[in-house]
């Protein structure tokens, strides 16, 4: 271009605060990807045309015409540039499962935060297949299959959505949705950890720091038993040794409303039964049929003795197959009149811990029937041959009643319409207490008058029974211990020094503590550029005050990557955790994110990263981040591809000149695959040890690192995990024998089956040195030096000799 009037496009011409806020906004629906597997290429082509013409969807088809790993590489490298493009992306996969498995395609979809549909077992005229394809066109650009999960828990009727919209809480509902997804993923990740570390099934217990009710449900979906640990519990205000007999229903109960279960005809039993299944792996379930609410749970290791006259062998087999539990179905009524363990087959639980769920009811003389049940359960609690942990009994007493061993008498969440309560019997229950019928009637009147969400929230009384009161920072951290500390340990009541010491001890002791906290510098950056957040937020250095639309207010400390890495912790994204766990994940997905969620980061101990995660495949790849932000900014600014790499090369050249490297020592290519060739040996002094460049070697400065640094301004960015992987993969590594090699399609594989190195140490550290200049260029000096500084500091710690 010799015309002197021609101006080379650059980022300063376009990027301003409005541009940056727009990028934050786009992140709400980032990665609008659907991966759809079917066996019919012509059908895929038809619907590809339909969805493209109707909604502008970008469509790719993997049909076997190109070798599968090459096809995956080309397709998903292309998609990586489009994930912030505001247009839906659909990939149709029509190759056979023997060529690329369901698991590989699910992992690949989830790596880009996509929805996944597997229908390769459906015939071309299958109504299921056709309906899914029709929905793909009808619901574009938001397909009605959740991202990164098999289920969704949010509003399912238009009236709920309308209520949210008219109260200006639609954005906040997306925050709740994604928060639930996050908790579900953390649980799935712990399940993966238990599997990999071969933790015995009866030891698969996770400690939850702080209280949030969804963990009970999502733990049981992953075959894990939860326990809570809290610094204190508000006094329930009821009778009995723990105040749980008709506890007071006041603002302490109602202030944190969490709706979390999916619509289900037996929804009223889900809260109760998941809680009871958490108390023991041996369950006597009386009145079990049909128990469809249990079918989505994973109960490997549980033994369920189920009594119900409607039980059949088919029901027993189906329940066992769906849940993985050992199910013994008895198709008769339980004998409450016979005070005998053997009469009801309970001798199988001798010398075992047992919990009992009672959901029985009779039409005739129900009061007498309840008295018989109560007497039997009081007797059973006193048996020494069986360790009865807890008994829940359906309670609808209409007369004054004296009770022994009563620990709690609680309203049944979702049970207001039938005025149902649950009595809980335990060895430490009240030895002799009188329950007045008039008192319970008044109590249920008050309960019935509450809103449904308030009624649901009373489940926290049940969860008090699996809660330990104590200081989480003093808990024992033996190897094999699993702890989820998300949205909790970062609370301002926990000094940062103690938290970092606790995490350091966890890493050194090879415990699995997953830690989540606000990201100090990303939050500060969002506020600096004027982003309107989903929650009102004030900052004083690293102390953050949150006020959400529900009226709740709390304070947290923010944390940075470098201070967590100093404590032995590495940032990993929720996306990577769900993808890494995709073979065991049985939680929920989501549809929309929120800026609030993107202010948080999650961290896992370095010992686990070094043991399990140094070999990067698509599940642990930052592929969904490394291209989309830089491509979006480059396209907004109309900066040509070649010009972008030339700008990047100039930054490298400028840095090397500042280190007195003679220009005759290298030859610049300034391309995407090669930054320069070393003509003669030179070294650059560096705090991590000298950077050594040998003659005749090609140097490709890491674009991944630079792209991750830009992404880190907007979303959680796993730069340190990536750096740990680059350090390990700085030499060729053999493919692991226990993984499908298709997961490594984004890597280069040698003919001998080795993964070629990604980058040399020098290429990574050289990129880190130009990182701030690069961010300043891309964001027109509206970058965050703090974000870049903490990333660079942590990377230097990774590579320090």
From Swiss-Prot:
UniProt-recorded Gene Ontology molecular function terms: GTP binding; mRNA guanylyltransferase activity; RNA binding
Top-level enzyme category: transferase
Signal peptide location: none
Keyword Oxidoreductase attached: no
Record's subcellular location: Virion; Host cytoplasm
Pathway as given in its UniProt record: mRNA processing; mRNA capping
E.C. number(s) listed in UniProt: 2.7.7.50
GO-annotated cellular components: host cell cytoplasm; virion component
Tagged with keyword Nucleotidyltransferase: yes
Source species, domain of life: Viruses
InterPro entries (UniProt xref): P5_Phytoreov
Chemical reaction(s) catalysed: a 5'-end diphospho-ribonucleoside in mRNA + GTP + H(+) = a 5'-end (5'-triphosphoguanosine)-ribonucleoside in mRNA + diphosphate
One GO BP: 7-methylguanosine mRNA capping
Keyword tags: GTP-binding, Host cytoplasm, mRNA capping, mRNA processing, Nucleotide-binding, Nucleotidyltransferase, RNA-binding, Transferase, Virion
Record-stated family: Belongs to the phytoreovirus protein P5 family.
Protein name: Putative mRNA-capping enzyme P5
Organism: Rice dwarf virus (isolate Fujian)
């Amino acid at each position: 271009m010799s015309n002197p009037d021609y101006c080379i496009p650059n980022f300063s011409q376009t990027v301003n605060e409005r541009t940056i806020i727009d990028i934050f906004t786009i992140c709400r629906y980032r990665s609008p990807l659907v991966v759809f597997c079917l066996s019919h290429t012509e059908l895929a082509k038809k619907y590809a045309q339909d969805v493209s013409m109707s909604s502008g969807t970008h469509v790719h088809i993997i049909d076997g015409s190109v070798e599968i790993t090459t096809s995956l590489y080309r397709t998903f490298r292309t998609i990586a540039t489009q994930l912030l493009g505001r247009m839906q992306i659909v990939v149709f996969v029509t190759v056979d499962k023997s060529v690329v498995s369901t698991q590989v395609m699910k992992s690949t979809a989830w790596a880009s935060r996509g929805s996944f549909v597997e229908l390769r077992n459906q015939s071309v005229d299958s109504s299921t297949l056709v309906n899914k394809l029709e929905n793909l066109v009808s619901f574009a650009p938001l397909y009605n299959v959740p991202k990164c999960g098999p289920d969704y828990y949010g509003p399912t009727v238009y009236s709920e959505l309308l209520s949210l919209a008219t109260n200006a809480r639609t954005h906040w509902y997306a925050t709740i949705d994604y928060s639930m997804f996050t908790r579900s993923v953390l649980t799935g990740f712990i399940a993966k950890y238990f599997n990999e570390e071969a933790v015995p099934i009866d030891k698969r217990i996770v400690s939850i720091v702080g209280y949030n009710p969804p963990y009970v449900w999502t733990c049981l979906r992953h075959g894990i038993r939860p326990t809570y640990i809290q610094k204190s519990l508000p006094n329930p205000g009821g009778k009995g040794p723990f105040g749980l007999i008709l506890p007071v229903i006041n603002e302490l109960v109602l202030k944190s409303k969490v709706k979390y279960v999916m619509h289900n005809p037996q929804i009223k039993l889900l809260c109760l039964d998941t809680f009871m299944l958490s108390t023991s792996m041996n369950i006597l379930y009386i009145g079990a049929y049909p128990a469809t609410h249990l079918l989505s749970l994973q109960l490997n290791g549980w033994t369920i003795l189920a009594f119900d006259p409607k039980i059949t062998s088919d029901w027993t087999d189906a329940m066992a197959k769906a849940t993985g539990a050992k199910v013994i179905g008895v198709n008769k009524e339980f004998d409450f009149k016979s005070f005998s363990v053997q009469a009801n087959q309970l001798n199988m639980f001798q010398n075992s811990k047992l919990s009992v769920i009672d959901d029985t009811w009779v039409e005739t003389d129900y009061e007498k029937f309840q008295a018989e049940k109560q007497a039997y359960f009081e007797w059973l609690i006193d048996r020494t041959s069986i360790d009865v942990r807890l008994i829940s009994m359906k309670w609808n007493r209409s007369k004054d009643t004296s009770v022994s061993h009563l620990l709690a008498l609680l309203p049944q969440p979702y049970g207001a319409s039938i005025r149902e309560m649950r009595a809980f019997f335990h060895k430490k229950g009240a030895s002799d207490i009188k329950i007045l019928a008039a008192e319970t009637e008044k109590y249920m009147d008050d309960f019935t008058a509450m809103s449904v969400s308030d009624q649901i929230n009373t489940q926290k009384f049940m969860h008090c029974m699996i809660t330990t009161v104590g200081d989480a920072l003093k808990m024992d951290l033996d190897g094999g211990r699993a702890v989820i500390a998300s949205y909790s340990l970062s609370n301002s009541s926990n000094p940062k020094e103690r938290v970092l010491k606790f995490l350091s001890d966890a890493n050194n002791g090879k415990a699995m503590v997953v830690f989540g906290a606000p990201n100090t510098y990303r939050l500060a950056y969002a506020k600096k550029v004027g982003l309107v957040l989903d929650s009102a937020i004030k900052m004083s250095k690293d102390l953050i005050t949150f006020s959400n639309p529900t009226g709740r207010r709390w304070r947290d400390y923010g944390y940075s990557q470098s201070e967590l890495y100093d404590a032995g912790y590495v940032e990993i994204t929720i996306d990577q955790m769900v993808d890494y766990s995709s073979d065991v994940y049985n939680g929920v997905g989501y549809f929309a994110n929120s800026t609030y969620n993107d202010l948080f980061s999650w961290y896992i101990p370095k010992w686990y990263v070094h043991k399990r995660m140094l070999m990067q495949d698509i599940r642990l790849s930052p592929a969904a981040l490394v291209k989309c932000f830089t491509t979006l900014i480059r396209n907004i600014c109309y900066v040509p591809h070649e010009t972008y790499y030339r700008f990047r090369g100039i930054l490298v050249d400028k840095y090397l000149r500042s280190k007195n490297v003679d220009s005759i020592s290298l030859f610049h290519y300034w391309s995407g695959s090669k930054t320069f060739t070393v003509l003669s040996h030179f070294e650059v002094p560096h705090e991590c040890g000298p950077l050594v460049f040998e003659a005749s070697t090609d140097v490709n400065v890491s674009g991944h690192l630079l792209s991750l640094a830009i992404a880190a301004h907007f979303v959680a960015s796993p730069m340190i995990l990536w750096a740990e992987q680059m350090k390990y993969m700085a030499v060729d590594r053999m493919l692991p024998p226990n993984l499908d090699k298709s997961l490594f399609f984004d890597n280069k594989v040698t003919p001998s089956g080795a993964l070629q190195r990604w980058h040399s140490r020098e290429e990574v550290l050289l990129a880190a040195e130009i990182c701030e200049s690069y961010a300043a260029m891309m964001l027109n000096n509206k970058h965050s030096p703090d974000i870049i500084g903490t990333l660079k500091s942590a990377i230097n710690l990774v590579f320090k000799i």
